[in-house]
C-alpha cells in the first residue's frame, strides 16, 4: 500500500485533477488519433478533488453563436464557453496549474498525447511546458498497447495516472 512508504508520517495532501477531452469529428476523415490530431479539442471537463469542483470549458458547437452557447449553459455552475480552441487550452492550463496529480480514463493513450499535441499546434511548443512543472517540456515516450507501438508524454514533475490502467490492474477478475 502506498501509505506504508511514508514511514508513520501523514501522507501529503495532493491536489488531484481528473480530466476528459472531447474532440471534433470530421465526416470525411473520421476521428483523429493522437498520432495525427487534425481535429480541434471542443471541450475539457475537469474534477478538482481538492476543491470538489467540476469545471467544463467548451467552444460553441458550429450550430450556435458564442452568445447562444453561453446562454444555454448559464444555469450550470463552472461551465465556461470560450470563443476558440486556443482560449480553451489556455484556460485548461490555468486550471491544472495547482494539480499535483492528473488523471483520466485512457489518458495515457489518448487525452495526454492529444492535448499536448494540440497545445503545441495551436499555442506553441513552449506552452506545452505548462503541462509539467519547473518549465520543463513533456517527455515523449513510446509504449505498446494491443500489439501496437503508440506515443504518449510523461509530465515532468506532475504525476499522471491513467485511471483505466489502474482499474484493470486493481480490479478483481476471475481468470
How should these model regions be labeled?
Residues 57-174:
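Conserved DEDDh/DEDDy metal-dependent 3′-5′ exonuclease domain
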Residues 1-98, 132:
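DnaQ-like (DEDDh/DEDDy) 3′-5′ exonuclease domain used for proofreading
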